[in-house]
Design a protein with these regions (language model features):
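Ligand-binding loop in jelly-roll beta-barrel domains
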Residues: 9, 17-22, 53-56, 101-121, ...
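C-terminal amphipathic alpha-helical segment
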Residues: 122-188, 194
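Conserved short histidine dyad/triad with adjacent acidic residue
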Residues: 23, 27-36, 50-56, 176-194, ...
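Loop-centered beta-sheet repeat module
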Residues: 75-120
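Short acidic-glycine-tyrosine-enriched beta hairpin
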Residues: 83-96, 110, 208-228
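Short, structured beta-strand/loop micro-motifs enriched in basic residues and often containing a Trp
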Residues: 73-81, 203-208
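Short, small-residue-biased leader/transition segments that mark boundaries at the very start
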Residues: 1-3
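Short, conserved beta-strand element in jelly-roll/cupin
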Residues: 15-19, 42-55, 63-64, 175, ...
Length: 242
């Protein structure tokens, strides 16, 4: 038996991504596809919490193709303005990105990403940019294989989690790979930490965790068996576990 279920590596990656420019349009495979086509690797399920963004910001989530045939045609013919779907976002939004979801972060957006511990990414489009004088590698065939058609609706792709009850573990998303919570601390709260671990990222404000001062930008892990967690102050925390 291993600490992290069926693997000896930590099951999640937590990243802060500060996109200065528009990032490439990409998609990730699921576990089954990655196992066959990527030497037994895991696929990638991830989610984004918008830490900050420009006014009237958008993000690429999903696409506008109705069938696999239309998807293939749009990609092979470079009909990117028809294919790519952008939706509006604001600070405090949460987006779940399942395998098969076309996605990309736009410039001027700061996000907290929680993901499966995998690095399998298929690049669909990179705005014809050059790297060392050459176009960056694209993964067209594999992308077409794994992209979900039709895409999840825009309305179901993003939700605002800015105004949730204070001093409680607010569940943002649960899947077989991770559980994501948002905690808005105002004054004092306690909870029992019985999960295998809990990653904690302070996304705003400052406070005290069991006597230890923390502030915006701090990351820490509450291990299994930590027991009673006492949070004090005025702060927001995004927490993740499995």
């Amino acid at each position: 038996t291993t600490l992290f279920r069926s693997s000896d590596r930590f099951p999640l990656l937590i990243k802060i991504i500060d996109a200065k420019d528009d990032l490439s349009i990409q998609v990730h495979p699921d576990d089954d596809y990655a196992k066959v086509h990527e030497n037994g690797s895991l696929g990638k399920t991830e989610c984004w919490y918008i830490l900050d963004c420009k006014e009237n910001a958008t993000i690429v989530i999903g696409h506008n193709a109705g069938t696999k045939e239309e998807l293939s045609r749009m990609i092979h013919e470079g009909k990117w303005s028809e294919f790519i779907r952008e939706i509006p976002i604001k600070k405090g939004d949460f987006l779940q990105i399942d395998p098969g979801t076309v996605h990309a972060i736009k410039g001027g957006t700061l996000i907290l990403e929680t993901q499966q511990n995998s690095d399998i990414t298929y690049r669909v489009y990179d705005y014809d940019r050059l790297s060392n004088g050459k176009p960056r590698e694209l993964h067209i065939d594999k992308s077409i294989d794994v992209i979900t058609v039709p895409a999840k609706s825009a309305a179901d792709s993003v939700k605002s989690v800015a105004d949730l009850p204070v001093n409680t573990l607010n569940e943002l998303y649960v899947c077989k790979y991770f559980h994501i919570y948002k905690i808005d601390v105002s004054g004092k709260m306690t909870f029992e930490q019985n999960a295998p671990f809990m990653n904690m990222t302070v996304t705003d404000g400052n406070g005290i965790v069991n006597g230890q001062p923390v502030k915006k930008g701090d990351h820490f892990i509450l291990p299994n068996g930590f027991g009673n967690v006492e949070l004090q102050g005025s702060m927001q925390i995004i927490a993740s576990t499995i």
